Amino acid sequence: LKVIEIKAVYKVVFFCTFAPSKQHIMVFDLDLIQRVYQELPAKIEYARKVLGRPLTLTEKILYSHLHPESEIKNYQRGGDYVFFAPDRVAMQDATAQMALLQFMMCGRDKTAVPSTVHCDHLILAEDGAQADLQRSLEVNSEVFNFLSSVSNKYGIGFWKPGAGIIHQIVLENYAFPGAMMIGTDSHTPNAGGLGMVAIGVGGADAVDVMTGMPWELKMPKVIGVKLTGKLGGWTSSKDVILKVAGILTVKGGTGAIVEYFGPGAASLSCTGKGTICNMGAEIGATTSTFGYDEAMSRYLRATGRAEVAQLADQVRDHLTGDPECYANPADYFDQVIEIDLSTLEPHINGPYTPDLAWPISEFAAAVKEHNYPQKLEVGLIGSCTNSSYEDLDRAASVARQAKAKNLKVKSEFTVTPGSELIRFTVNRDGQLDAFEEIGGVVLANACGPCIGQWARHTDDPDRANSIITSFNRNFSKRNDGNPQTRSFVASPEIVTAMAIAGDLTFNPLKDTLTNEKGEQVRLDPPVGVELPPRGFEVEDAGFQAPAADGSSVQIKVDAESNRLQLLNPFTPITDNQLQGMRILIKAKGKCTTDHISMAGPWLQFRGHLDNIANNSFIGAINAYNDQANHVANYVKDASQATFMAVPDSGRAYKAAGISTLVFGEENYGEGSSREHAAMQPRHLGVKAVVVKSFARIHETNLKKQGLLALTFANPGDYDKIRQDDKIDILGLDTMAPGKQMFVVLHHSDGSSEQFAVNHTYNQAQIDWVKAGSALNKIRQDLGQM
């Protein structure tokens, strides 16, 4: 990339909470917040009148954010597609590249709604915060300059590398109760901790909203989780969502918003609520949220937004569900779960999936029963899920005990603050010292190991081993690229205790440890406060405001760059392209977006579609040989398979003019919101993806890129597909909402079979297919094509 020198003057804003004599305090987009709250009561009252019943909080937010193109009526949950008008958009640096490359093609001068870019994914964790950040600035300067310049041109707020993780920054600065936002990261629901409906999406969805187009979502079902009692001892908010994940599984929340309520909900801190909402992504939920309460008010005031708290207080009855919904939840929610916080145990979930939930009282036995490596090699705390002041304060109380009782960590131990505001404050208040004094290493304010941006210190990168994190996901190879790493998820305080013990079977609730003097000592339950007693403080929060007029800012992308590539529009799929197709891969078992488009070292190519396509499906397991990245190709010889890497096979078929398709099993595309997992197959010539069921975000991303996202009418038909089949898909020319299509398998023995497939396309989405992609349709509507 070669970006011309930008002459515009950047307005740097230092944001913090207290000590106003040292820092400038500001509230972002106050006019937007005032408008939302001014309009909210009338919108909710009208929706209540039309629906003729009390409303959940979820319904209040959704119905108050209907786009003008959607009439107010009783939409069928899980059935009707609805147009919405979100209040804002947030993007992280790995997904923002493709989102902004698409936005640049639309011809707008500025984004239609407030939008931000957050540089958190491209910082590799290796040596510690300062060294890692400096290295990232050097290695990724091309991408950071591009994102900064595009943000400056189009009126987008830019959070520099080191400022923090997108979801923590959003919670500290932008989230407000009753609002609706979308973000190009699957953990965007974190903002539900401040009473938002915040939904993770692909970049093409972000383009819809940034261009002022209506944003479409199937009206979600609503799952109610009633919390009673109060947390105590070693149990934390993290354990609530770990328990819920065990109940609902990784697909149990698909197509639903999870709404937490009850006296137990009111007892949780705002950031604790954020943790629960954050990991709602792991149950497939569209998002999760809590009603406005005193904890949220305290957090708004502590983060310099007293004005927002005052505005919210004036409409607080509209920022929570109607009392009737909570008094008789079975009448208003599609499913109800009840959890007593007073009896909830700490949980440890994993390995390989975040819904394998173990109460800590059962975990040691599970370790031995399943032969998980008992030695704990690394404990990692922080990430967007658990890096609040409260999280680090409680974990630091465990670390301080360890020092006082002559203990040090026996495992490698890392700490990732969620933002510079958090890092500066916990450095001032001594929590970072407490971690370092027992052997901890503080990493940069970034995603790091959570997303595979981790140069792990290990003597054997392929050895079976165990790690434990306070992160959100623990898919195979996600953290360190090693399929033999058993990754477990727990709260920061449990992770800290386990790192001190160095043993996966240690239970801090009852077990003792031998200290450096040979004494048997026990760790007491953690203690901590939800907000810093002396207030938050920061010198430079890392925010860069855009130029008031970005029209003179020019952006150039070097044609020889291997990091960035301007996009060419996808061409529409035609009926003849769906004849005689070959299988790119028939994926077996879990096939997440990490399997389809790995992160880690591949993040550097997220702005270059052709280069990132070289990682397509390299983690997926081929159903025909149980191997990863080893599939049959029939270009050279139609009757004899040549085995090669999946991307190579895709390129070979594409060069030969042969369309391909992908088959998969349940919850296909689970995990990240990365639209690359849809764009890469499209780029390689895939025309259709046929699976037993989809994860919500990925299904939408496939539709947005003009692909056919289809599901087996009979899941057993998956077993009929042979490796060397030639395949037709019938029905594109007559495709209509609710109308089945058909797959014809032409076997090499001359026989053939046909089966039905379903789809969830509405007419607008079918128009995306006919246009080649949703972006093409937007450009047509804006007169850019």
Please annotate each region the language model reported.
Residues 261-267, 651, 655-694:
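Extracellular/luminal Protease-associated
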Residues 28-29, 93, 176-310, 406-407, ...:
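Mobile "lid/hinge" segments at catalytic clefts and subdomain interfaces of large enzymes
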Residues 17, 513-530, 698-768, 775-778, ...:
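Acidic, glycine-rich flexible loop/linker segments
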Residues 33-36, 40-220, 607-662, 667-669:
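Long, structured ligand/cofactor-binding scaffold of large enzymes
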Residues 5, 11-22:
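Short, positively charged and aromatic/hydrophobic N-terminal segments
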Residues 134-138, 143, 148-152, 156-183, ...:
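Accessory "access/gating" subregions that flank catalytic or transport cores
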Residues 492, 525-648:
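Long, charge-dense accessory insertions within large macromolecular proteins
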